[in-house]
Amino acid sequence: TKANSMTTGRIYKSVIDKERRGDYLGKTIQVVPHITDEIKRNIKLLGQKYHYDFVITEIGGTIGDIESAPFLEAIRQMKWELGKRAINLHLTYVPYLKAAGELKTKPTQHSVKELQSVGIQPDVLVLRTEKHLDDDIRKKVAAFCNVDFDCVVQSEDLPSIYDVPINMLNQGLDEAILRKCGEQIGDKPALGPWREFLDRQRKATKEVHIGLVGKYDLQDAYKSIREGLLQAGVYNDHK
């Protein structure tokens, strides 16, 4: 729905419209508090409207981008206001240098330091990587980034994006999040239908080639169509 997506343009338009109506009583419009308050209002709106237990909000871009500064400030304020009811999960990249045959954690360390410099301490780190990370690397990242060891999980390259939730479950990401939120940890979910889908995907034997004519070169522009076709194919023994 409309409440599930938030753009910078929509945030600024909403603030400008409020200023034109006189909602701010003639005050000078500032990034803090007016823009940040509007960002927080939009984030909270989804949970208040539909009474969700959890609301997941993604802040796109890269730490340090000037465009994301108001959003990061809003997130910092929300953590301060909500305490344990909000956690910050940071997705970061651990590159593999093929020539040297080693994984480098410096980009992750610097990324976290950038976050800390604006007042945000990640509660959980998800390390995006091409190669498997051993415990020594995870311990190093945990120590340098002030994050609990069991809250440093890896997201390595997998055959299918649908394998990722199983990988996260096996590493205990769900339990780490529940602990950080002070929630009770129940039985481990079986994810039967999800595993059945993955099994069907691996065992699909027939191939079908579908041409999609579109306006844009970027594949993600048609992500929902591509994934819809993929899922329909899996349930009909096609890949």
Language-model region placement:
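Flexible phosphate-sensing "switch/lid" loops adjacent to ATP/NTP-binding sites
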Residues: 1-238
